[in-house]
């Protein structure tokens, strides 16, 4: 009887594995395609019933762009931001206030261990915009939702005509965002940030006085470009603007990703000469040493296996004080 029960359970597991592994693969009937059936990334921009560009889709950073710094090539072009350094495209770096420059240097010298990404806290929309994990845009009347695979982040951009609340006593990790259409461009203003924010992995700061303007355009089916201006007089001597480029990932969906905080993980973070954190470079080796009973399912895109005994840490890490 036991043997028969075991065989039935084993068969159910075998049958269910292909199903769970394939569920994100679903052809988008709206996607333009070439003669060989591949998605035509240069196809026409999709539009909503009212004629506005439809930003909906699953996106990731372009293969060459947000991961590699590059200065602007013309007066009309803005420097490309990177995941590690949002100001990497500026010849002289970001226009930091003296105290903010000192804070950034301190964060980098500490291997960015207090980055919200390490402690599984919300990253803020700037880090999310350049993150290597995909994000999904859902455009509907009155609101645009951005669902981030990493940290399961959710951001709302209200397009119903409302204004940003004045003197809002409740700061937000993502700020409070309202958008309006200017032709084919969605212009998004965000204010109301928490103090102590991080714009990138290095730790370029964002304070409670920060204000951002993002200009979303979709020049073709496969691309979204975001021109982002940061205006934070407390941390920077002047406003500055960067460009972020996203490419659509057609015929798929975002999946579950869990971040389980662990003090030991933060203490292990060291940077390799390649510029990648050694803790992530060696993730595969560490996972192999974990007992099978504690190993997460293979479709989890996180280092959760190294963080199963995490203590609780709810407070925002110390970010320094303005001088």
Each predicted region: which residue ranges?
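PEST-like low-complexity, intrinsically disordered acidic/proline/serine-rich tracts
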Residues: 2-6, 11, 17-305
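Cationic, low-complexity basic patches in intrinsically disordered or flexible, solvent-exposed regions
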Residues: 308
């Amino acid at each position: 009887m036991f043997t028969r029960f075991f065989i039935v359970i084993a068969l159910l597991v075998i049958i269910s594995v292909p199903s769970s592994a394939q569920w994100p693969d679903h052809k988008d009937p709206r996607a333009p395609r070439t003669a060989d059936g591949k998605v035509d990334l240069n196809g026409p921009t999709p539009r909503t019933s009212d004629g506005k560009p439809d930003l909906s889709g699953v996106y990731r950073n372009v293969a060459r762009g947000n991961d590699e710094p590059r200065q602007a090539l013309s007066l009309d072009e803005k420097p490309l931001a990177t995941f590690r350094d949002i100001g990497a495209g500026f010849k002289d770096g970001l226009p930091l206030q003296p105290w903010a420059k000192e804070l950034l240097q301190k964060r980098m010298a500490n291997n960015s261990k207090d980055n919200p990404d390490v402690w599984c806290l919300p990253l803020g929309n700037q880090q999310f915009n350049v993150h290597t994990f995909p994000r999904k845009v859902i455009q509907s009347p009155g609101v645009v939702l951005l669902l981030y695979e990493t940290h399961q982040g959710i951001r709302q951009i209200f397009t119903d005509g409302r204004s940003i609340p004045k003197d809002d006593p409740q700061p937000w990790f993502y700020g409070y965002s309202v958008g309006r259409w200017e032709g084919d461009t969605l212009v998004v203003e965000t204010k109301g940030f928490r103090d102590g924010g991080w714009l990138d992995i290095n730790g370029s700061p964002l304070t409670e006085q920060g204000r951002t303007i993002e200009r979303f355009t979709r020049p073709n089916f496969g691309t979204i470009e975001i021109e982002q201006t940061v205006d934070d007089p407390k941390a920077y001597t002047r406003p500055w603007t960067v460009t972020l480029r996203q490419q659509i990932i057609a015929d798929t969906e975002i999946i579950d990703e869990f971040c389980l905080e662990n003090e030991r993980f933060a203490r292990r973070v060291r940077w390799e000469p390649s510029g990648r954190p050694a803790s992530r470079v060696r993730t595969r080796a560490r996972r192999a040493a974990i007992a099978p009973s504690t190993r997460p399912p293979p479709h989890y895109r996180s280092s959760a296996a190294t963080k199963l005994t995490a203590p609780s840490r709810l407070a925002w890490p110390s970010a320094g004080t303005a001088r």
